Amino acid sequence: MNSSTSTMSEEPDALSVVNQLRDLAADPLNRRAIVQDQGCLPGLILFMDHPNPPVVHSALLALRYLAECRANREKMKGELGMMLSLQNVIQKTTTPGETKLLASEIYDILQSSNMADGDSFNEMNSRRRKAQFFLGTTNKRAKTVVLHIDGLDDTSRRNLCEEALLKIKGVISFTFQMAVQRCVVRIRSDLKAEALASAIASTKVMKAQQVVKSESGEEMLVPFQDTPVEVEQNTELPDYLPEDESPTKEQDKAVSRVGSHPEGGASWLSTAANFLSRSFYW
């Protein structure tokens, strides 16, 4: 009779499930379906209270992706436990500083989804000040670098690029715009953009140029020097920060992941939701 507690070893663990949801949420074409699914959004909320920090980290990345879709924000904000769980992550003393900042940004986006402009601005500034207080002296100012990556044309290349960027100490977050072969990277202010180019060049199949705007507002591609830059290795996963500075818009231009099909994604969401509904009791 007690079948719901049987053979958990045969099912995916929480980290693999949340990582799959994160990867699906990275594709703009999947974001509405994930939020509309009856099990996935509540599951991500429960993941925020998981005792394993990488699970919390991955859940927040997924939520940040989902919040990029404006049509999702009201439903996300109204989902039972969403705002409270984000507050708990921010206020918990054991939460890493950058994870607090990530949770605070998601909270800002959802909280301001139905505010007047003035109220939204004040609320977001207040939340950011609070997050920076939690970060303390370890919080350095971040900057955004937009890269055009020759060779970034399928999922396997994107995975290679992800692995290269994750190894760089000082990379806070990144998001891809596959349709235009771009990557928007948030980095510490003391990290040079050349380090990103060196890491991408190390893949041997991709090469990066920096996207900058001229005084007239036109975009230009600036090549990096071929001289390799020594890259300090990172031992921690970065957290996701917004790509507001991106000079391009991804909406209506995004491509689905290679080999993926809408019906396949729906089937996986159903499997994940089934796992979520039976497994979140710690």
From Swiss-Prot:
One of its GO terms (cellular component) is mitochondrial outer membrane. The modification Phosphothreonine is found at residue 137. It is found in: Cytoplasm; Mitochondrion; Mitochondrion outer membrane. The keyword Membrane applies. It comes from the Eukaryota. Residues 239-261 are annotated as: Disordered. This is Armadillo repeat-containing protein 1.
